[in-house]
Protein backbone atom coordinates (compact mmCIF):
# COMPACT_ATOMS: atom_id res chain seq x y z
CA UNK A 1 0.00 0.00 0.00
CA UNK A 2 1.36 3.43 -0.95
CA UNK A 3 2.17 5.95 1.75
CA UNK A 4 -0.12 9.01 1.81
CA UNK A 5 1.44 12.31 0.78
CA UNK A 6 1.49 14.70 3.70
CA UNK A 7 2.47 18.41 3.89
CA UNK A 8 6.09 17.56 4.75
CA UNK A 9 6.51 14.62 2.34
CA UNK A 10 9.80 14.70 0.40
CA UNK A 11 9.98 12.17 -2.43
CA UNK A 12 13.22 10.94 -4.05
CA UNK A 13 14.96 13.28 -6.51
CA UNK A 14 18.41 14.50 -7.45
CA UNK A 15 18.79 17.78 -5.56
CA UNK A 16 21.64 20.24 -5.90
CA UNK A 17 22.27 23.82 -4.89
CA UNK A 18 23.67 26.23 -7.46
CA UNK A 19 24.80 29.81 -7.82
CA UNK A 20 24.69 31.92 -10.93
CA UNK A 21 25.89 35.38 -11.82
CA UNK A 22 23.68 38.00 -13.45
CA UNK A 23 24.78 40.32 -16.26
CA UNK A 24 25.04 43.15 -13.70
CA UNK A 25 27.27 41.10 -11.37
CA UNK A 26 24.89 39.82 -8.68
CA UNK A 27 25.20 36.25 -7.38
CA UNK A 28 21.95 34.34 -7.05
CA UNK A 29 21.44 31.12 -5.08
CA UNK A 30 19.06 28.34 -6.03
CA UNK A 31 18.27 24.64 -6.14
CA UNK A 32 17.53 22.15 -8.88
CA UNK A 33 15.38 19.12 -8.08
CA UNK A 34 15.35 16.66 -10.96
CA UNK A 35 13.88 13.18 -11.38
CA UNK A 36 15.99 10.12 -10.68
CA UNK A 37 15.10 8.95 -14.21
CA UNK A 38 14.40 10.95 -17.35
CA UNK A 39 12.93 14.44 -17.12
CA UNK A 40 9.78 15.17 -19.11
CA UNK A 41 10.20 18.94 -18.82
CA UNK A 42 11.25 21.70 -16.46
CA UNK A 43 9.66 24.48 -14.46
CA UNK A 44 11.49 27.67 -13.50
CA UNK A 45 9.84 29.12 -10.38
CA UNK A 46 9.68 32.89 -9.82
CA UNK A 47 8.80 33.58 -6.20
CA UNK A 48 6.42 36.06 -4.53
CA UNK A 49 7.41 39.53 -3.33
CA UNK A 50 10.61 39.31 -1.25
CA UNK A 51 9.70 42.35 0.84
CA UNK A 52 6.63 40.40 2.03
CA UNK A 53 8.54 37.17 2.75
CA UNK A 54 8.51 35.64 -0.73
CA UNK A 55 11.49 33.43 -1.59
CA UNK A 56 12.38 30.24 -3.43
CA UNK A 57 11.21 28.18 -0.43
CA UNK A 58 7.69 29.67 -0.45
CA UNK A 59 5.45 26.70 0.32
CA UNK A 60 4.02 26.00 -3.14
CA UNK A 61 7.46 25.94 -4.74
CA UNK A 62 9.04 23.93 -1.92
CA UNK A 63 6.29 21.31 -2.21
CA UNK A 64 6.68 21.24 -6.00
CA UNK A 65 10.42 20.59 -5.63
CA UNK A 66 9.75 17.93 -2.99
CA UNK A 67 7.24 15.99 -5.09
CA UNK A 68 7.02 16.75 -8.82
CA UNK A 69 10.37 15.20 -9.84
CA UNK A 70 9.22 11.82 -8.48
CA UNK A 71 5.50 12.10 -9.26
CA UNK A 72 5.61 13.69 -12.73
CA UNK A 73 9.22 13.43 -13.93
CA UNK A 74 9.52 17.23 -13.95
CA UNK A 75 12.68 19.16 -13.08
CA UNK A 76 12.03 22.08 -10.71
CA UNK A 77 14.42 25.05 -10.70
CA UNK A 78 14.01 27.56 -7.87
CA UNK A 79 16.17 30.56 -7.03
CA UNK A 80 16.18 33.68 -4.90
CA UNK A 81 16.03 36.97 -6.76
CA UNK A 82 18.45 39.71 -5.73
CA UNK A 83 18.50 40.53 -2.02
CA UNK A 84 16.32 37.53 -1.11
CA UNK A 85 17.14 34.97 1.61
CA UNK A 86 16.03 31.37 2.15
CA UNK A 87 17.52 28.14 3.56
CA UNK A 88 19.74 27.94 0.47
CA UNK A 89 21.32 31.31 1.27
CA UNK A 90 21.05 34.94 0.30
CA UNK A 91 21.30 36.30 -3.22
CA UNK A 92 23.41 39.45 -3.43
CA UNK A 93 22.00 42.81 -4.44
CA UNK A 94 18.89 44.68 -3.46
CA UNK A 95 15.24 44.24 -4.42
CA UNK A 96 14.50 46.67 -7.26
CA UNK A 97 10.73 46.47 -7.68
CA UNK A 98 10.96 44.19 -10.71
CA UNK A 99 13.30 46.36 -12.76
CA UNK A 100 16.82 44.97 -12.20
CA UNK A 101 15.23 41.57 -11.56
CA UNK A 102 15.21 41.27 -15.35
CA UNK A 103 18.88 40.29 -15.03
CA UNK A 104 17.91 37.63 -12.48
CA UNK A 105 15.28 36.11 -14.77
CA UNK A 106 17.60 36.22 -17.80
CA UNK A 107 20.44 34.55 -15.85
CA UNK A 108 18.12 31.83 -14.54
CA UNK A 109 16.64 31.12 -17.98
CA UNK A 110 20.12 30.92 -19.51
CA UNK A 111 21.23 28.60 -16.68
CA UNK A 112 18.31 26.29 -17.45
CA UNK A 113 19.17 26.03 -21.13
CA UNK A 114 22.95 26.42 -21.17
CA UNK A 115 23.97 24.52 -18.02
CA UNK A 116 21.07 22.18 -17.26
CA UNK A 117 20.34 21.62 -20.98
CA UNK A 118 16.58 21.52 -20.43
CA UNK A 119 14.45 21.00 -23.52
CA UNK A 120 10.96 21.98 -22.39
CA UNK A 121 10.99 24.96 -20.00
CA UNK A 122 7.89 26.56 -18.54
CA UNK A 123 8.06 29.56 -16.23
CA UNK A 124 5.74 29.66 -13.21
CA UNK A 125 5.35 32.99 -11.44
CA UNK A 126 3.53 33.53 -8.19
CA UNK A 127 2.30 37.05 -7.30
CA UNK A 128 5.38 39.29 -7.80
CA UNK A 129 6.87 36.37 -9.75
CA UNK A 130 4.07 36.71 -12.32
CA UNK A 131 5.06 40.31 -12.93
CA UNK A 132 8.72 39.53 -13.57
CA UNK A 133 7.62 36.58 -15.73
CA UNK A 134 5.41 38.76 -17.93
CA UNK A 135 8.00 41.55 -18.12
CA UNK A 136 11.24 39.57 -18.41
CA UNK A 137 10.67 35.88 -19.30
CA UNK A 138 10.27 36.54 -23.03
CA UNK A 139 13.08 34.27 -24.22
CA UNK A 140 11.71 32.40 -27.27
CA UNK A 141 13.00 29.07 -25.90
CA UNK A 142 10.44 29.23 -23.06
CA UNK A 143 7.35 27.15 -23.87
CA UNK A 144 4.83 29.23 -21.90
CA UNK A 145 3.89 30.84 -18.59
CA UNK A 146 1.76 29.81 -15.65
CA UNK A 147 0.72 32.75 -13.47
CA UNK A 148 -0.46 32.21 -9.88
CA UNK A 149 -2.34 35.19 -8.37
CA UNK A 150 -1.09 37.80 -10.86
CA UNK A 151 -1.45 41.33 -9.42
CA UNK A 152 -0.54 43.05 -12.74
CA UNK A 153 0.51 46.18 -10.85
CA UNK A 154 3.87 46.68 -12.58
CA UNK A 155 3.15 45.06 -15.93
CA UNK A 156 3.01 47.58 -18.76
CA UNK A 157 0.75 47.67 -21.80
CA UNK A 158 3.74 46.80 -23.99
CA UNK A 159 4.33 43.60 -21.97
CA UNK A 160 0.69 42.56 -22.32
CA UNK A 161 0.78 43.39 -26.04
CA UNK A 162 3.93 41.27 -26.44
CA UNK A 163 2.25 38.21 -24.95
CA UNK A 164 -1.02 38.82 -26.82
CA UNK A 165 0.87 38.74 -30.12
CA UNK A 166 3.38 36.05 -29.14
CA UNK A 167 1.07 33.05 -29.24
CA UNK A 168 2.73 30.96 -26.52
CA UNK A 169 0.30 29.65 -23.92
CA UNK A 170 -0.31 31.51 -20.68
CA UNK A 171 -2.45 30.10 -17.89
CA UNK A 172 -3.48 32.48 -15.09
CA UNK A 173 -4.94 31.17 -11.84
CA UNK A 174 -6.60 33.50 -9.34
CA UNK A 175 -7.95 31.68 -6.29
CA UNK A 176 -11.38 32.69 -5.08
CA UNK A 177 -10.10 33.26 -1.54
CA UNK A 178 -6.75 34.89 -2.33
CA UNK A 179 -5.47 37.11 0.48
CA UNK A 180 -4.86 40.04 -1.89
CA UNK A 181 -6.63 39.47 -5.22
CA UNK A 182 -10.32 38.90 -5.83
CA UNK A 183 -11.44 37.53 -9.21
CA UNK A 184 -14.11 39.60 -10.96
Regions found by a protein language model. Name each.
Residues 1-41:
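N-terminal cap/lid segment of alpha/beta-hydrolase-fold proteins
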Residues 26-118:
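Serine-hydrolase catalytic machinery in alpha/beta-hydrolase-like enzymes
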Residues 124-133:
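Gly/Ala-rich beta-loop-alpha elbow adjacent to hydrolase catalytic centers
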Residues 135-144:
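Conserved hydrolase catalytic core segment
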Residues 153-154, 176-181:
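Acidic catalytic loop of the alpha/beta-hydrolase fold
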Residues 158-160, 168, 181-184:
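Short alpha-helix in the alpha/beta-hydrolase fold that links the catalytic acid
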Residues 165-167, 171-174, 178:
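Short beta-strand/loop motif that positions the catalytic acidic residue
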Amino acid sequence: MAEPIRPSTVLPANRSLFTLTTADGETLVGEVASPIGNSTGAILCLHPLPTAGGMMDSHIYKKAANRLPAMAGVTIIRFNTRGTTSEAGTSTGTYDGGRAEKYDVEAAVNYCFDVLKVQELWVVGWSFGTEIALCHAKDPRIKGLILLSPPLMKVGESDLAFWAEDGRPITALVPEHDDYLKPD
